[in-house]
Structure formats: structure tokens, C-alpha cells
Amino acid sequence: MKIVNQEKVKNYILGLIKSGRKDYVKATIDCFNISKSSVYNYVKQMEIDGLIEKNQNTYILKTNTYHYFLKNDGTLGEDRIYNQFISQHIQFKKNVNSIWNYAFTEMMNNAIEHSEADNISVSIYQNCLDTKIFIIDDGIGIFKNIQRFMKESKNETISLRECVSLLFAGKFTTAKQYHTGEGIFFTSHVMDEFIIYSDDNFFTRNNFKSSQVEDGNLHSFMQMEKGTLVSMTISNNSKKILSEVFNTFAPVDEGFIKTTIPVAHMFAGGNPVSRSEARRLLECIVLFNDIVLDFSGVEEIGQGFAHELFVLGKQKYPHIKLRTIKTCKTVEDMIKRVINTSAIQ
């Protein structure tokens, strides 16, 4: 008789409950070939252990919530906030603790030093599978701050949506004398889910779904009149290692030379067509040597965009290596067409 791994069964059930599956009993029976009574015993024990709780006619993961409210009066230090309030809730394996220490202090530093906020709050939503942390400030708003910086430093008037796009590559900062602009980039890559919301605009590398917006915790903060919300989520049992994420994009001997761009997220509508869009993308990536362009969700691109990026861009910036991934046939054909046409001229 096959011995069932009880921890594996439990985690399987928890995953189904988290995803909202109503048929978790049948699915577990089919997956592990165990009886219905055995599944109910697992569920009952998890309820006793405080991992799940009843919600009308089904179960949900039990979430513990903690809130902290801070005055940004010039005395705050992100490390002190983490050690005093946050670390007591982050008691996992060393790799996860390290990720939270890095991510939280990076994002809290942004709120303290760049937001011009009077008040900063931290909310923690924790269940047996994941931990989510919100950092919310009532300041100028991250995208409006970028917009103001571009106007004052370059005399460029850009939309808030364009301000979002400047964050994808990494290295962008409104205070080069103090910061490298790497915090958001690496935090967004090491987290399972990373979202910045401000003034009705989102920055995220994730496949942002309406269900995330409809999440009660996130939606309640979307009603704020000004400021910035940073949402970070990672599995309590994540296998990610912070140093490996850094080494992927910033090898020790070379520095931060690699980046990846989710093209669909970078441009309004997700299907870039113009030369000006390509030029803006090039401006973001020219500081890197190795660039991966992720075309997930992009259904088509314009001839002008493709020519400006893959032909003229390569001529103007010969040091950059452009690699594409997850291209559909339409996009792939357009890229090949402009490159091949250029080669015979």
C-alpha cells in the first residue's frame, strides 16, 4: 500500500482553498487516492490548528492582520522600523527572512526619503502560505514625483503612464547623488507579487488580474486621494535566494549590466507600434549590455517600432545585446522582416 505524505496532502488542500476551489475534497481524493473521510479529517485538523476558517459554506485561509502607523517626522529609520515592528512576524527560513529584510527596508526608505509624506503606515496580512506587506504613504505619489523630476531636470512633460514605464529597466532614480535606482527593480524580481499603486496607475511585473484589484485589502487603499501604496507578497516557504536574484542581473565582476523588460506592461495598450515608443524603450535600456525583452501578452508590434528598436537601435548602441522571449508568430515575423529588409539594403 502506498504511503501518503501527509504534509504534501495538507499543502495541496491549502493551495486549493487559497485559489478558491470549491471542489477541493474531490480534487484531493482524485490526486492522492484517499477516502472522503480522510480529506475531511485533514480539513478539520487544519481548522483546529488555526490554518483555515469557515466562511459561509466553504473554507478560507485564516489571515492574521497587523497595522502600524508612523509619523514621518525626520527621525524614522527603515532598519529600526523593520527590527521593531516587522521582524517579529517574519520568522521563516533564512532565505525568506533575508528577502523580507532587503525588500522592506528598500521600499520603506523610498517612503521616508522620497514621498514627502507626513504619515506612513504598514499593514501585514499573513496566512500559513504567504505573507503580504503594504507600505502606504500620503505623499506626492511616486509617479507624480517622477513626472515633476522629468519636467524640472529635462524639461520633458510626460504622462503618469510613461512614468510607470521608466521603472521597468532599473537604474532610474530621481536622486542619483543618493540612490542607484535598483531597489524597485530587484524587489520586484525577488517577490512573488509586487505592485505599486499611485494616482490610478500600477507598476507590476506580474500578470495583473482584476481579482487582485478586487482584493478587499488592496481595493480599500485604492480609494486614497494621494500618496503611494507598495504591495509585496512572497511564499512563507519560498526557495528564492536573494543573492541569486542579484547575480542573475548584476554579476559580481560586471555589475548591474542585465535587465528584463515586460513589453506589454511598459506601453499603454500593450502593443507598441511607433518609433517614439521604441526610442523611449532604448533610453531606458542603453545603460545595460544584456537586455531580455519579454513579449508575453503582446499580440503585434508596428513596423516603425521594430525597425527603430532592432535595426537603428542596434546601430546606434552596438554594445547592447537584445534578446526576445515569448514572442507570438506575428511579433516574431515583424522582427525578422525589418532585420532581413535592412540586411539587403
Positions of the model-derived regions?
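Bergerat-fold GHKL ATPase/HATPase_c domain
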Residues: 1-105, 114-121, 238-282, 321-345
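Short, surface-exposed connector motifs at secondary-structure boundaries
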Residues: 22-23, 287-292, 318-320
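Conserved beta-strand-loop-beta-strand hairpin that lines the nucleotide-binding pocket
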Residues: 53-67, 112-242
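Helical mechanochemical/support elements of P-loop NTPase systems and associated helical scaffolds
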Residues: 160-163, 183, 277, 305-306, ...
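A short acidic, amphipathic alpha-helical/loop segment
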Residues: 186, 280, 308-309
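A short acidic (Asp/Glu
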Residues: 207, 302-307, 333-335
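Short, glycine-/small-residue-enriched flexible loop/hinge segments at domain edges that mediate gating
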Residues: 267, 288-301
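Short, non-transmembrane amphipathic alpha-helical segments
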Residues: 305-316
